[in-house]
Regions:
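Short, hydrophobic, well-ordered secondary-structure elements
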Residues: 16-37
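Long, charged low-complexity segments
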Residues: 42, 51-115
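Amphipathic, well-ordered alpha-helical segments in soluble domains
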Residues: 3-7, 23, 30, 119
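A structural signal for alpha-helical segments
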Residues: 12-15, 19, 104, 111
Length: 130
C-alpha cells in the first residue's frame, strides 16, 4: 500500500512538471507567432500550425534575430531543454541505477523559466529597436 501511494505521489509530481513544461512550450509557441507577425511580410506562409521548435527554426532564418534565436534552439538552449525534460519525464524509470543526475527538480525548472524570460525580454527589446 505504501509503494502504491509513493508511485501515485511521484506520478502527480511528474504530471505537474509535465504540465509546467507544456505550458512553457505553449507560451513560447504563441510568442513565436507574435514574433512572426512582426518580422515577416504578408507573403510568407503562416507558421501557426507548426510545432514550437519548427516555428523557432523558421524564425531563425531571419537575419535580424537569428543570433538571438539560434543559441536557444540548439543543444542546451531553452527549446532544447524543454524537449529534453519532457523526454525525461516520459521515459520509464530504471530502478537498477543507484544514482542519476538526470532528475528534474524545482531548481532546474526555475532556471528554465528564468532563461526563457530573459530570452523573451531580449528578443522583445531587439524587435522594438528594429
Amino acid at each position: 500500500q505504501d509503494i502504491a501511494k509513493n508511485l501515485l505521489e511521484q506520478t502527480n509530481l511528474n504530471n505537474q512538471n509535465y504540465l509546467f513544461l507544456i505550458s512553457l512550450e505553449k507560451s513560447l509557441s504563441y510568442f513565436a507567432d507574435e514574433v512572426f507577425e512582426k518580422v515577416q511580410s504578408g507573403d510568407h506562409e503562416a507558421i501557426t500550425n507548426f510545432s514550437c521548435k519548427v516555428k523557432w527554426k523558421s524564425l531563425a532564418n531571419n537575419p535580424a534575430i537569428q543570433n538571438i534565436i539560434i543559441p536557444e534552439i540548439t543543444h542546451g538552449g531553452v527549446i532544447d531543454c524543454i524537449h529534453s525534460y519532457q523526454m525525461l519525464l516520459i521515459a520509464p524509470k530504471r530502478d537498477d541505477l543507484i544514482s542519476s543526475d538526470s532528475s528534474i527538480d524545482l531548481k532546474k525548472l526555475n532556471e528554465l523559466l528564468d532563461r526563457s524570460y530573459r530570452w523573451i525580454s531580449l528578443l522583445r527589446k531587439n524587435l522594438d529597436e528594429c
